[in-house]
């Protein structure tokens, strides 16, 4: 694995599959405006950090409030992961990729947001969750 080969490791099939399922569950929850489903994909701890388009959200309560407000302002949300690469450092899996959100606001206005993101995931209490997510809008 590139210049980081001594540190970074490719994922074994089981870990890769589990992380692909995590991504799929998150995409489905966001596209269904399912707050509980989205929150189930995230670390349930004050240590959770999301950096979304310049806004730092710390802990599940802040993320839940953000999602509640976002979903309340949208008639529909559709998320698609365009591409993603996963690798591990010890017990942590990192991912980097791009995604596209398609929104329809309550007034019918449609918009598209493309993002580049990096996240860190860990297996906590038997399930993989996002512990850090940093997304930046692509112009």
Positions of predicted regions on the chain:
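A beta-strand edge to alpha-helix "cap/lid" segment located at domain peripheries
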Residues: 1-40, 47-139
